[in-house]
């Protein structure tokens, strides 16, 4: 600990029999204190975020923090603004973009693209988790919103099954297959077997169309009919089949097809 020692004033002459007291020392103690970094710049986004919170930053400044540095002859703020402009200045559209889109943007290499893709996926998973916790199964709109978050932006087809108890409480959500409905292995007997294992009273099935169109195909309708009949044999019910696009959904139940 740093200290400074100061000599006491000279003492008067004393008799040898009367020894002089030991000289006193005054110690100045400097307590440690927080100091700003020498190069702290409160006007920069990172410093303002730490001092005032993320709400103090613009969308472009938040994106700039993710990019870290500029590229393609631009500084980082110009790069962030250009990236947002590509998506109509919409953070949501940027987060909904397919992963490969980022690597085609000037100045964004694999490292920066990986950061953006990771943030996109973290955001998506957090929203899916939040939606699942709050999802009332007896609300078709809430179920469709959850499914759109979970599989709406996948670049390939995914088949999802929601297993429900007798009170329409959610038991489990499982992704049964990937690919396309004409090629992926969706076996009604396996879904029925899983329903029996989970003691499920009813099910909701869903799959996405990466093209964005939600009109069911003939194969979609055939699979729905076969599964509906197979579940009826074990006293379980197919409540709905939801086709999920990027921005819309189609409900077999709402259309009167179940």
Curated annotation (Swiss-Prot):
Residue ranges of domain MPN in the record: 136-258
CDD domains membership: MPN_DUF2466
N-terminal signal peptide: none
Annotated PANTHER family: DNA REPAIR PROTEIN RADC, UPF0758 PROTEIN YEES-RELATED
Family, as annotated: Belongs to the UPF0758 family.
Entries under NCBIfam families matching the protein: PRK00024.1, radc
Protein name: UPF0758 protein Bcep1808_2579
């Amino acid at each position: 600990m740093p200290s400074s020692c100061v000599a006491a004033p000279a003492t008067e002459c004393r008799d040898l029999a009367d020894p002089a007291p030991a000289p006193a020392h005054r110690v100045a103690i400097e307590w440690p204190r927080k100091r700003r970094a020498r190069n702290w710049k409160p006007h920069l986004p990172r410093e303002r975020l730490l001092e005032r919170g993320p709400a103090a930053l613009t969308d472009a400044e938040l994106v700039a923090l993710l990019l870290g540095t500029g590229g393609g002859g631009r500084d980082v703020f110009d790069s962030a603004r250009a990236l947002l402009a590509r998506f109509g200045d919409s953070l949501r559209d940027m987060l909904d973009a397919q992963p490969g889109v980022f690597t085609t943007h000037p100045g964004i290499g694999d490292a920066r693209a990986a950061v953006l893709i990771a943030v996109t996926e973290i955001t998506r998973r957090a929203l899916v988790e939040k939606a699942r916790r709050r999802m009332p199964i007896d609300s078709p709109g809430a179920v469709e919103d959850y499914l759109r978050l979970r599989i709406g932006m996948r670049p390939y087809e995914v088949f999802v099954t929601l297993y429900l108890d007798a009170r329409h409480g959610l038991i489990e959500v499982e992704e049964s297959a990937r690919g396309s409905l004409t090629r992926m292995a969706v076996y009604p007997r396996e879904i029925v077997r899983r329903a029996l294992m989970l003691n499920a009273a009813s099910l909701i099935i869903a799959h996405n169309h990466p093209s964005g169109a939600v009109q069911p195909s003939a194969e979609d309708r055939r699979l729905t009919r076969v599964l509906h009949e197979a579940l009826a044999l074990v006293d379980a019910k197919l409540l709905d089949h939801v086709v999920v696009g990027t921005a819309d959904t189609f409900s077999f139940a709402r259309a009167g097809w179940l």
